[in-house]
Amino acid sequence: MRYIKFFKELNNKNVNLVGGKNASIGEMFQELVPIGIKVPDGFAITSEAYWYLLEQGGAKQKIIELLENVDATEIDVLKIRSKQIRELIFGTPFPSDLRDEIFQAYEILSQQYHMKEADVAVRSSATAEDLPDASFAGQQDTYLNIKGKTELIHYIKSCLASLFTDRAISYRASRGFDHLKVALSVGVQKMVRADKGSAGVMFSIDTETGFKDAVFITSAWGLGENVVGGTINPDEFYVFKPTLEQNKRPIIKRQLGNKTQKMVYAPRGSEHPTRNIKTTKKEWQSFSLSDEDVLILAKYAIEIEKHYSKEAKQYRPMDIEWAKDGESGEIFIVQARPETVQSQKTKEENQVFEKFKFKNPNEKKEIILQGRAIGSKIGSGKVRIINDLEHMNSFKEGEILVTDNTDPDWEPCMKKASAVITNRGGRTCHAAIVAREIGVPAIVGVSGATDSLYTGMEITVSCAEGEEGYVYAGIYEHEIERVELSNMQETQTKIYINIGNPEKAFSFSQLPNHGVGLARMEMIILNQIKAHPLALVDLHHKKSVKEKNEIENLMAGYANPKDFFVKKIAEGIGMISAAFYPKPVIVRTSDFKSNEYMRMLGGSSYEPNEENPMLGYRGASRYYSESYNEAFSWECEALALVREEMGLTNMKVMIPFLRTIEEGKKVLEILRKNNLESGKNGLEIYIMCELPVNVILADDFLSLFDGFSIGSNDLTQLTLGVDRDSELVSHVFDERNEAMLKMFKKAIEACKRHNKYCGICGQAPSDYPEVTEFLVKEGITSISLNPDSVIPTWNAVAKLEKELKDHGLTAR
């Protein structure tokens, strides 16, 4: 056949003939199907067929005339011309020989699947599409559940006409592509019955930070167009590549999306071949993929990335669409293309750490809305609410675009925006992809944004605070901090990072560092669990109906309270451990005080009213108590899961507020019973050296544990007898006090005597350079800092160590 190529005949060398999408499907069919990756079969109608059609009746010349002198920024003119061109293509009849070839290929495909008329997807594939430096994805149309020759011909024509939508013309103009040098091929691919299963998008790289060692997967019930189009908020998963390849099960994040609707087949004879129906409560409260499915997809992503990188002779992260057949249970890859944002950063750009931050971070700001952050920038301006494309011409440069959901035709408008906010969508929808590519901060999945905001309202959009994006009332000034990482000198003293928010882990791992000196368990409990641990242990007792319902809503997607608690904690710790792997990550077990626990959901039923909670029921004393022991065992199970199931053996454990040697023995026994034993698979167990008794009896504590991490905050409070929360005596609280320096010195010396680890993770080194200098000279193993202190402290330590070396001195 002259104008038809079956997928098995194609590979990536055929881009000019069948476009990037079809060439890539052919490549996978030839190279990846043999190693077990499933790809639905089909055929491509070549770009030669496109030119053949345009030669009929002089259509090509008419298109040239209609595009002459069109300014892509003149939205009204662009809309008129693009509509005229599409109508022209629709009105041009298929030559009979081309139509006959299409029908013959369709018959062969139907017979292959033992069907009279196969249900197929009809997809556009532009000859300049899916190249590493351009994201044509979604600019031309895709049609699902097409069945029969009449429908097939109609939707192939629809695909060809979609080469001239407003956005497609605008994009080509902005990238310097000649409109008549970009052709369109059409792919016809057997449908996967995802209408009875699930579908989505995955990337072999983190789309926000460029972290290379994670596969990011989005998923929803039904056909995948809702995920791609951003009309629902999908489930999200992260899988860590290095330990997955060691046959571990490193699902380091699961996030349940609301998935309010799903796309299914429409009855034959309907106006459209697919339709959306509401999901059931069970569906939106359940993950649309099992853990096994997530791991299969991640393995597919790794193999696809390896193949395309090998072929390109350079690292090539991939953007992949997948579908799970609800009838057979099989998972298929339906498209794969190079990722177009993170992969395009130059080596020089990757050597610069760029951080957007508010000029006055302590200024009080009113959060009015929040959703999923896209990118890491900040934008501010006046709101412009646009509910449909007809009003796009009212949008002014620098305004903030607020709409229900952006589809590919919105790009001319998005390019003018200082930020974008949508009611719906996830991190892999077209709006998110385009926002990343043009460098505009966007927040998607902001329920009710178009109702809560109004045109002309002044707001600030921040995507610089982690995975969650915030909309603030008013305009707040921001600045950009840029640091050249290539100039950083190595240090002998290890520089670690303190981290409490797993969502920032991938970003913070790009700072110069030797690992994590303090990962705060309690921050994960506070932000992910939200309920008192004992309220979960004891879910069916002592609960009001309201409280019980709130807790059950938090647990949606998980089998039971224990499954929820253990997996959520493991995911948070796993995310941090993966981000810094294989560098050490020291996790401090939970260290809430009773008044802090009391404020959590259900907490008032379990906590005493203490006069001085700072010195009360906290730390190790809580772990072995009869009332809290089971909750701590769950915590231990989560830590063991990170090391054993996820394979993240770089994670170490640290016990806070340990008062006596006897307490130490009790806690170690609980850890041992929960598969956390010092020395097993390289595990080290430290304690926070934050009580004077830890220093006074350092030799005894170090005979039980593998090292100290000095907690300068509590150690200063308890050595100087100062309530660190009291303003009346705050002037006395000073880690530079001579007594404190002696405490630090004694702790370091004790660790050296026992040849054990000694670090510091309190606030002192972040605040006082002279304390850092003292610790370096005393020979401390590591200094763990708040992220904003890492670079200046690193440079100061490198300079100090060089000066010591130049004078023939070394740390003690």
Curated annotation (Swiss-Prot):
Q: Which PROSITE patterns match?
A: PEP_ENZYMES_2, PEP_ENZYMES_PHOS_SITE
- The keyword Ribosomal protein belongs to this UniProt entry's keyword annotation: no
Q: What is its EC number?
A: 2.7.9.2
Where do the catalytic residues lie? 430 (tele-phosphohistidine intermediate), 761 (proton donor)
EC category name: transferase
Q: Which SUPFAM superfamilies did the record assign? A: Glutathione synthetase ATP-binding domain-like, Phosphoenolpyruvate/pyruvate domain, Phosphohistidine domain
- Give the record's keywords alphabetically: ATP-binding, Kinase, Magnesium, Metal-binding, Nucleotide-binding, Transferase
Pfam families assigned to the protein according to its UniProt record, in alphabetical order: PEP-utilizers, PEP-utilizers_C, PPDK_N
Keyword hit for Nucleotide-binding: yes
Q: Which reaction does it catalyse?
A: pyruvate + ATP + H2O = phosphoenolpyruvate + AMP + phosphate + 2 H(+)
Q: Which cofactor does it need?
A: Mg(2+)
Record: residues binding substrate: 520, 588, 690, 711-714
Q: Binding of Mg(2+): at which residues?
A: 690, 714
The family classification in the record reads: Belongs to the PEP-utilizing enzyme family.
The written remark on domains in the entry is: The N-terminal domain contains the ATP/Pi binding site, the central domain the pyrophosphate/phosphate carrier histidine, and the C-terminal domain the pyruvate binding site.
Miscellaneous comment as given in the Swiss-Prot or TrEMBL entry: The reaction takes place in three steps, mediated by a phosphocarrier histidine residue located on the surface of the central domain. The two first partial reactions are catalyzed at an active site located on the N-terminal domain, and the third partial reaction is catalyzed at an active site located on the C-terminal domain. For catalytic turnover, the central domain swivels from the concave surface of the N-terminal domain to that of the C-terminal domain.
What does this gene product do? Catalyzes the phosphorylation of pyruvate to phosphoenolpyruvate.
Read off the PANTHER family from this record.
PHOSPHOENOLPYRUVATE SYNTHASE
Name the record gives this protein? Phosphoenolpyruvate synthase
Q: Which organism is it from?
A: Helicobacter pylori (strain J99 / ATCC 700824) (Campylobacter pylori J99)
Q: What is this protein's gene name?
A: ppsA
